[in-house]
């Protein structure tokens, strides 16, 4: 049984990890443990690079907390231009898989608050009246009226991040480069 460390205690993220590992490895083939670790980036990362660094740093910190585990998974949501998205980072042994989620265009009323230094989740809570939005369906759930959720979008991206660990083509050695 695989020991999977989720570099988060957020239920929406842990649910996405659970769904992805169910799909790839099967229910009952792993156990997930959530740990609270720092991302090393601001609470609201801006830009793809900063967001990806946050996901990678979560994995690095989770590996330090639980080095005996088999997998470590970091998810970091961010804002780039007028879009929200997230980076998924999965490590197993010495290999890494990464994927970026789908993006959602945000309305100006939300972006104004973010430009003033507030987090997307806090802005959504104020405008929607739903407390703790980011641990539920997230902005995605609110704007799509539940057709998509933070969990469902992260699930898809996690499936892509897990590909290097189960697709045999990724295990093949690279062909030698021809001599020039």
Curated annotation (Swiss-Prot):
Which Enzyme Commission numbers does its entry carry? 3.6.1.73
* UniProt keyword terms in alphabetical order: Hydrolase, Magnesium, Manganese, Metal-binding, Nucleotide metabolism, Nucleotide-binding
Q: Catalytic activity annotated for this protein? A: XTP + H2O = XDP + phosphate + H(+); ITP + H2O = IDP + phosphate + H(+)
- List the InterPro entries hit by this protein, alphabetically: ITPase-like_fam (IPR029001), Non_canon_purine_NTPase (IPR002786), NTPase/PRRC1 (IPR026533), YjjX_NTPase (IPR050299)
Which residues are listed for Mg(2+) binding in this entry? 38, 68
Task: State the free-text cofactor note.
Answer: Binds 1 divalent metal cation per subunit; can use either Mg(2+) or Mn(2+).
Q: Which cofactor does it need?
A: Mg(2+); Mn(2+)
- What residues bind substrate, as annotated? 8-13, 68-69
Q: Which Pfam families match?
A: NTPase_I-T
Q: Name one GO molecular function term.
A: nucleotide binding
Query: What are the BP-aspect GO terms?
Result: nucleotide metabolic process; thiamine metabolic process
Q: Which family does it belong to?
A: Belongs to the YjjX NTPase family.
- Cite the record's note on assembly: Homodimer.
Q: What does this protein do?
A: Phosphatase that hydrolyzes non-canonical purine nucleotides such as XTP and ITP to their respective diphosphate derivatives. Probably excludes non-canonical purines from DNA/RNA precursor pool, thus preventing their incorporation into DNA/RNA and avoiding chromosomal lesions.
State the protein's name.
Inosine/xanthosine triphosphatase
**Species annotation:** Yersinia pestis
């Amino acid at each position: 049984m695989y020991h999977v460390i989720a570099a988060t205690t957020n239920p929406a993220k842990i649910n996405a990890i659970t769904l992805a590992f169910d799909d790839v490895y099967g229910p009952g083939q792993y156990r997930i443990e959530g740990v609270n670790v720092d991302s090393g980036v601001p609470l609201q990362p801006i830009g793809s690079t900063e967001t990806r660094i946050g996901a990678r740093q979560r994995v690095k910190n989770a590996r330090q907390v639980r080095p005996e585990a088999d997998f470590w998974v970091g998810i970091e949501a961010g804002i780039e231009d007028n879009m929200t998205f997230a980076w998924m980072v999965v490590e197993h042994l010495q290999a890494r898989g990464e994927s970026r989620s789908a993006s959602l265009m945000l309305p100006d009323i939300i972006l104004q608050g973010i430009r003033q230094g507030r987090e997307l989740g806090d802005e959504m809570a104020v405008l929607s009246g739903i407390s703790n939005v980011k641990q539920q369906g997230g902005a995605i759930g609110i704007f799509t009226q539940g057709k998509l959720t933070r969990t469902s979008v992260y699930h898809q991206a996690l499936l892509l991040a897990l590909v290097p660990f189960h697709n045999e083509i990724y295990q093949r050695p690279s062909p030698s480069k021809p001599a020039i």
